[in-house]
Amino acid sequence: MLHAAQIAGAGSPYVVVIGNEKGGSGKTTLAMHLAVALLKEGQRVGTIDLDSNQRGLTRYIENRRIWANHRRIELEMPLHHLVLRAEGAKLRDNEAKELAAFEGIISGIRKSVDFLVIDTPSTDAYLMRLAHLVADTVLTPVTDSFLDLGTLASVDPVTHEVTGTGHYAEMVCEARMRRRQFDQGHIDWIVIRNRSARGQLVGHSITELGIRLGLRDVEGCAERIVYRQFFPSGLTALDALDEATFGAIPGQSHRLAQQEMRILIGFLNLPIGERGRRRAAARKEWYASAQAPLEIDKVLID
């Protein structure tokens, strides 16, 4: 069986883990948008949902499949898997089962995908730590709130200076250290701050934390209701902004969401290959020709 430490080895997909112990930070929304963005770039994408209780990413993808069939449209779909949490009486047995399930999925798809996007639960669990250990990039979305920042750092209430490292940040640092030990790999950790009008002080604290821990701090998306409206239909801000796709004419909020999401994905600097871009261009050309009406000389027969 493939050992977990080999998942990130040569010939394996580039692994992006979406993680934060704070619920409601937008992990699943980010995971879905990233997967669709990579698919639109012609990359072969696998997704794994490690939150077997909420199953947010699993339901998001299933909604997308149902919506595409209902609207009779083509929507990019990742190769998706759900890892169930073991519920036995013995912790060691549970971890062995979860490791086997995780490794089994990776073994089955590692040669079929270029990227693997993993959505994690908002709890410190074995699967959560395992995913971070094999990550090439960790994305941590946070809202502009000192309450949400608590999983990353403790902050002085007067000066807003960082005074300590939070539990989740310690877990990521441990994963980075262990990763260096077994394959000299580097985990690129990016904290994505979702923007609000009140978040300037939070931004300063995250920047200070970045200097301490060697993480990248990028500005994310605004808090828009439209992101929550995407879930029932499985759509994203990166899908075609037309009535055929959405079932209604998209508004200005859709266009703004698309623009800011494209900017965010660009900031991540993921290794998107030229081969994938050529694949995306060919797919786009094929789809355009399939939708175009036939020329009259191709219809009439002498």
Predicted regions and their residues:
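Short aromatic-enriched loop/helix-cap "lid" or pocket-rim segments at secondary-structure transitions
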Residues: 58-61, 151-154, 203-204, 230-234
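Short, hinge-like loop/turn segments at secondary-structure boundaries
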Residues: 63-67, 157-159, 236-238
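P-loop/Walker-type NTP enzyme "switch/lid" segment
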Residues: 15, 19-25, 37-116, 122, ...
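Generic structural signal for helix capping and beta-alpha/helix-loop junctions
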Residues: 55, 147-149, 228
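C-terminal lobe/tail of nucleotide-utilizing enzymes
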Residues: 1-10, 180-302
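Active-site signature of alpha/beta-hydrolase-fold catalytic machinery across serine-
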Residues: 33, 37, 130
